[in-house]
């Protein structure tokens, strides 16, 4: 019998799970700084714990834990944790003396290196009180198998408020909690026959609903149920692909047209990444730094250059990478390349599963002039968008491709990659990940405290020892720089260069700081 409390992980979600090793935990998070209300004398940790307890039903996926398939022969499922207790996930922590921002960053970096407990829902939150200037901090981490950047923003809307004194949120009733556990038993065979019949009755129009052929599952985690459910999925997936074939063919046709353009081969050749000191085997240690830049200054640069905020983020990242590699005498002659994630999430979609693809953009680190770098990045980013945009409609189909029997192989490959030191030998596919996620223009509050900064904390892996992720929040861009501790032990040095690089770009474009 299928239940609404069981959900199979997508291919993308499962990839994050099976790629995880001791050196490469696959969770993302944030270091959030909050300003406590004037005259506050309460216990912020207790207030936050109460808020999570009252609102956890608004984000039900936070109560799901993993149910692995027997022998890992198929993707695991999310099942509701019947023993869920919020106190196992929201905990108090203390920043040691001198309790400043640098100490907090080092502590969050150390905590980010620790993997999540797979026996429980894959998220944790730590509350740091006792910071100077009437501030507190919240470090959160959540497995990337559960969430992407777009879903993270949606989750924020549920847990955060737009005023310090919000109206009460809906409270979960016992009836509502019990209703999700009950579902009428359906005849699997007849449902499959009905789906086949529906396929031939349905006109094959662009954008057919992916759920039109959603067949029931047994929902069991025993070997027999997993095999049956995998067989059902192997029938369901081709039905969905067939129903969406016009859109798929249109996407492939657009991609082929772009690939046949005269400059396409030149564009692909420019995406080859050089080997650098950042593209090596990593340890489990992490180094983290958060830096804030003025959104107004970045937008002024975007307007002056004819680009967007994301283009300026790439130019700033390019500049600090060039500065850092020059400082350690390790700048390659060829330009570094960046992988830029792109959300495939439709507007209003708040599902927590990953819906993302991406593009590769050369960063022009071989150019000394900041303006020339910016212009090159603008041209390369536009070219890369043109190449990858036709693939956006394919993401939902690829995320559900049948994978029976492959998870175990994927895990073995991940283990081999770590133990063989292959990242020190093979050329990197890309040099760095640079991600820019819009967070919110309006201020957010949590348990009455105002969020002042939300510094993202992402993932580094073998061969990719540095990650730059940015949140646009209110009137600032909050940069989160995550690095492997054995490669960049003091990533705050790179963070400090961001301000200098912003000034250099402003000077190059004749903008007064």
Predicted feature descriptions by range:
Residues 19-24, 422-425:
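Short secondary-structure boundary/capping segments within folded domains
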Residues 1-12, 31-44, 49-464, 468-499, ...:
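Soluble acyl-CoA-dependent acyltransferase catalytic core bearing the H(X)4D motif
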């Amino acid at each position: 019998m299928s239940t609404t409390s069981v959900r199979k992980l997508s291919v993308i979600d499962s990839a994050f799970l099976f790629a995880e090793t001791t050196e490469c935990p696959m969770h993302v998070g944030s270091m959030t700084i909050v300003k406590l209300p004037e005259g506050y004398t309460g216990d912020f940790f207790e207030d936050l714990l109460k808020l999570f307890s009252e609102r956890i039903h608004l984000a039900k996926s936070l109560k799901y834990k993993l149910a692995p398939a027997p022998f890992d022969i198929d993707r695991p499922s999310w099942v509701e944790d019947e023993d869920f207790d919020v106190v196992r996930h929201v905990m108090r922590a203390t920043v040691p003396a001198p309790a400043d921002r640098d100490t907090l960053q080092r502590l969050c970096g150390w905590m980010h290196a620790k993997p999540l407990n797979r026996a429980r829902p894959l998220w944790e939150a730590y509350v740091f009180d006792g910071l100077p200037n009437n501030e507190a901090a919240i470090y959160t981490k959540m497995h990337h198998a559960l969430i992407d950047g777009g879903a993270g923003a949606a989750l924020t809307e549920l847990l955060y408020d737009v005023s310090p004194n919000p109206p009460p949120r809906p409270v979960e009733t016992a009836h509502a909690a019990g209703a999700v556990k009950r579902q009428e038993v359906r005849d699997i065979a007849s449902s499959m026959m009905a789906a086949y019949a529906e396929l031939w009755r349905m006109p094959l129009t662009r954008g057919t609903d992916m759920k039109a052929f959603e067949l029931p599952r047994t929902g069991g985690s025993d070997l027999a149920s997993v095999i049956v459910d995998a067989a059902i999925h192997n029938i369901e997936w081709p039905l969905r692909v067939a129903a969406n074939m016009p859109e798929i063919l249109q996407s492939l046709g657009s991609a082929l047209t772009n690939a046949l353009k005269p400059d396409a081969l030149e564009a692909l050749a420019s995406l080859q990444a050089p080997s650098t000191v950042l593209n090596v085997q990593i340890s489990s240690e992490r180094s983290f730094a958060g830096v804030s830049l003025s959104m107004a200054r970045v937008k002024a640069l975007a307007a002056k250059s004819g680009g967007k905020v994301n283009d300026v983020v790439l130019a700033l990242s390019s500049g600090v990478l060039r500065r850092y590699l020059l400082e350690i005498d390790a700048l390659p002659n060829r330009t570094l390349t960046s992988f830029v994630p792109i959300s495939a999430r439709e507007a209003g979609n708040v599902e927590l599963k990953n819906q993302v693809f991406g593009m590769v953009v050369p960063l022009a680190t071989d150019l000394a002039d900041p303006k020339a770098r910016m212009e090159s990045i603008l041209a390369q980013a536009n070219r890369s968008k043109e190449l990858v945009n036709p693939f956006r409609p394919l993401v939902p189909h690829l995320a559900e491709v049948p994978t029976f029997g492959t998870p175990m192989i994927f895990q073995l490959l991940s283990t081999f990659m770590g133990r063989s030191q292959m990242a020190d030998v093979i050329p990197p596919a890309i040099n760095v990940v640079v991600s820019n996620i819009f967070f919110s223009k309006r201020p957010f509050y949590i348990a009455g405290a105002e969020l002042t900064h939300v510094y993202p904390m992402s993932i580094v892996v073998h061969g990719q020892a540095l990650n730059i992720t940015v949140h646009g929040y209110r009137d600032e861009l909050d940069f989160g720089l995550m690095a492997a501790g054995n490669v960049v032990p003091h990533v705050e040095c790179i963070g400090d260069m961001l301000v200098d690089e912003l000034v250099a770009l402003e000077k190059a474009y004749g903008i007064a700081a």
